[in-house]
């Protein structure tokens, strides 16, 4: 019977320096070889996931604190904030002097994040 395995990233799959133990890599590869699906489940957006994690070979992810679900690179679920909600969050962060990163469904890499920061159609 095949199973679905969900792995957290920070502090579970990777230590806080971003290092993935070789034993974890081998366990994931063996699980997939045995017919199980392996997903990461993380607060990170897809663009914030280390390339080394993707290189292991995963069936995909639940990311952005549950706001997006991908299976085999296909978007299965995507919940975005309305423009009003986004503005309220951005204002709240600015009022407190907090740094933040906005990512969207189209953000697939850190380069995309940087492009979004400099060419965002919605002023922050």
How would you describe each model-predicted region?
Residues 19-121:
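Active-site phosphate-binding/coordination module
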Residues 1-2, 63:
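Short, small/polar residue-rich loop motifs at catalytic or cofactor-binding pockets
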Residues 3-18, 40:
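Asp-based phosphoryl-transfer active-site loop
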């Amino acid at each position: 019977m095949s199973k679905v395995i969900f792995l957290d990233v920070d502090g579970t799959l990777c230590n806080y320096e971003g290092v993935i133990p070789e034993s974890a890599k081998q366990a994931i590869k063996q699980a997939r070889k045995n017919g199980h699906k392996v997903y990461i489940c993380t607060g990170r957006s897809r663009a914030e996931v280390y390339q080394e994690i993707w290189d292991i070979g995963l069936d995909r992810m639940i990311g952005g604190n549950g706001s997006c679900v991908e299976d085999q690179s296909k978007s299965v679920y995507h919940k975005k904030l309305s423009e009003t909600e986004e503005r309220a969050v951005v204002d709240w962060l600015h009022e407190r002097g907090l740094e933040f990163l906005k990512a969207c469904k189209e953000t697939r890499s850190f380069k995309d994040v940087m492009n979004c920061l400099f060419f965002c159609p919605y002023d922050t």
